[in-house]
Amino acid sequence: MLGAALRRCAVAATTRAGPRGLLHSARTPGPAAAIQSVRCYSHGSQETDEEFDARWVTYFNKPDIDAWELRKGINTLVTYDMVPEPKIIDAALRACRRLNDFASTVRILEAVKDKAGPHKEIYPYVIQELRPTLNELGISTPEELGLDKV
């Protein structure tokens, strides 16, 4: 019902005619624009860090994961306000290798470097933790490929 009221307000605002008969948006909001905000709190339990890590490791370890699910998982993981744990990145890199998707491996490593932001010690730590996996899977870092100089 709230969505319908918002749609009516948006339609009414965009269909008002100006002096020459042209459509323009209204400068002053109508009475329907005075909708109060509603707080939507979840009363569910909070996910612990261990549960979060296990959920993502399980997601990337699915044997039947396809390229779309891999990219969706990576995109969702990147939207969180944190740097993923090395074990999550390890599982994602292994999923990329199962799908022979080298471009996604580079993208994951670049995203980790970007998420680390000004904290210059995080990315080298993650690479150090992932070095055995990178060597095992034959994955080069963006720095080894020269992509950091582009």
Curated annotation (Swiss-Prot):
Q: In which pathway does it act?
A: Energy metabolism; oxidative phosphorylation
Q: In chain numbering, where does the motif SIFI-degron fall?
A: 2-17
User: Which membrane topology describes this protein?
Assistant: Peripheral membrane protein
Question: Does the record carry Mitochondrion as a key word?
Answer: yes
> Gene3D superfamilies this protein is in?
Cytochrome c oxidase, subunit Va/VI
Q: Tell me how this protein assembles.
A: Component of the cytochrome c oxidase (complex IV, CIV), a multisubunit enzyme composed of 14 subunits. The complex is composed of a catalytic core of 3 subunits MT-CO1, MT-CO2 and MT-CO3, encoded in the mitochondrial DNA, and 11 supernumerary subunits COX4I, COX5A, COX5B, COX6A, COX6B, COX6C, COX7A, COX7B, COX7C, COX8 and NDUFA4, which are encoded in the nuclear genome.
Q: Superkingdom of the source?
A: Eukaryota
Residues recorded with modification N6-acetyllysine: 87, 113
Organism lineage string: Eukaryota, Metazoa, Chordata, Craniata, Vertebrata
> Which family is it part of?
Belongs to the cytochrome c oxidase subunit 5A family.
Question: Which biological process annotations from GO are given for this protein?
Answer: mitochondrial electron transport, cytochrome c to oxygen
Q: From the Swiss-Prot or TrEMBL record, give the protein name.
A: Cytochrome c oxidase subunit 5A, mitochondrial
Consult the record and explain the modifications the protein receives after translation. In response to mitochondrial stress, the precursor protein is ubiquitinated by the SIFI complex in the cytoplasm before mitochondrial import, leading to its degradation. Within the SIFI complex, UBR4 initiates ubiquitin chain that are further elongated or branched by KCMF1.
Gene Ontology molecular function, alphabetical: metal ion binding
Localization, per the record, is: Mitochondrion inner membrane
Q: What does this protein do?
A: Component of the cytochrome c oxidase, the last enzyme in the mitochondrial electron transport chain which drives oxidative phosphorylation. The respiratory chain contains 3 multisubunit complexes succinate dehydrogenase (complex II, CII), ubiquinol-cytochrome c oxidoreductase (cytochrome b-c1 complex, complex III, CIII) and cytochrome c oxidase (complex IV, CIV), that cooperate to transfer electrons derived from NADH and succinate to molecular oxygen, creating an electrochemical gradient over the inner membrane that drives transmembrane transport and the ATP synthase.
Q: Which InterPro entries match?
A: Cyt_c_oxidase_su5A/6 (IPR003204), Cyt_c_oxidase_su5A/6_sf (IPR036545)
Q: What is its main location?
A: mitochondrion
